[in-house]
Amino acid sequence: MITAPLLTFVVSVLDRDVREEAKANTEQEVQTALDYIEQDLAQAIYVYDSTGINGSPQNNNPIKDQVEFPNRSPILVFWKRNFEENKIPPQGDPSRNCSEKDCDDTYVYSLVVYYHSTNNPNNIWSDAARIERLEIQDQIVNRFLPKDDDNYVIEPADKGFNSIPLDKNVDDNNNLGDLQQKMNQWTKDKDKDFDPPKVLIDYVGTVGTVVAGTVDCTNVSTSAQLVGTANSGFYTCADSSKTLAKVFIRGNSLARIQDNNRCTANSTYCPTGSVTVQGRSLFGSYN
C-alpha cells in the first residue's frame, strides 16, 4: 500500500530535479551568449536596423540577401573594426613575417551576422532553435609596400568579403548619400561563398513555440526598429543612427527534457535575458 505513493513521490522529485537542472543550464548558457554578444557588439562601427536587413521601398538591396543561408534568419548584423596585433612588418622590411617585438599593429573591418537558426544537419542539434554567428574579415596588408608587391597581402580576406562602399555614389546622379545609404549598398564577393556560420548557443525558442507578444523598441531609442519576431528565441531592437542594439534571447529548457516544448507566458523554464549595447568603434584608416 505504501509502495505506490512512495514511488510516485520519488518520480516526482526526480522529474523536478531534471527540470531544475535543465533550467539552470539554459539560464547559464543564455547569459554566456549575451556576454559574448555584448563584447562583440561593443566593437561595432555600424549596426543594421530592420530596413537595412530586410529591405524597404527605399532599400532594394537588403543585407539579408547578401548573407543568406537556408533555415536561418539574420537578426543582428553589424560592421566592426578589429584590432590586429603584431601583424605589419616595419617599414623597409619586405617580408610577410617579422618578430613580435618589431611588428606594428593594425585595424581591419569585418562584417558580423547573428542568425536565428533552425538548421539541423543530421539531427546533431536539438529540436529547438539556435543562434549562429558568421564573421568575415578583410585582408591584412603591408601598408608600406605597393599593392602589386608579392608580399603586400599578409593575410587574405575571408571568403565572400567585399570592402565597405564608403566612396561609392548611391545613385546614377553621383549623389554621395548618407552613411545608411552607403552601408545598404554592400554586396558580397559573388565569386566566393562564405564558410557556414557557427553555433553560439542551442536550445533557444523557435518562432512557432513561443508566446505571442509585442515589443516596444522606442524604449531603446525613438528610431530603433524590431528585427525578428517579438518574444521569439532571438530578436533585437536596432538603431543604425546610434550604432545601438538591444538583444533579447529566450532559452527553452523544456526542449532538453520533453517533446511538448512550447514556452507559455512567463514560464520559468524558458528563461529570458537581454543586453543593450552601443558600438564604441569609429570609422578610420586601416591597413
What are these regions (language model features)?
Residues 21, 25, 29, 52, ...:
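A sequence-level detector of short, solvent-exposed, charge-rich linear segments
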Residues 43-78:
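Short, glycine/small-hydrophobic-rich surface segments
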Residues 1-9, 61, 73-82:
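Long, hydrophobic/aromatic-enriched structural stretches that serve as scaffold segments
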Residues 18-25, 55-64, 93-101:
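Short helix/strand-bridging catalytic loops that position acidic/His residues to coordinate divalent metals
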Residues 1-38, 42:
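Aliphatic-rich helix starts adjacent to a transmembrane/signal segment
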Residues 80-287:
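Intrinsically disordered, low-complexity regions enriched in Pro/Ser/Thr/Gly and acidic residues
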Residues 11, 42, 46, 83, ...:
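Residue-level marker of positions within ordered structural domains that often coincide
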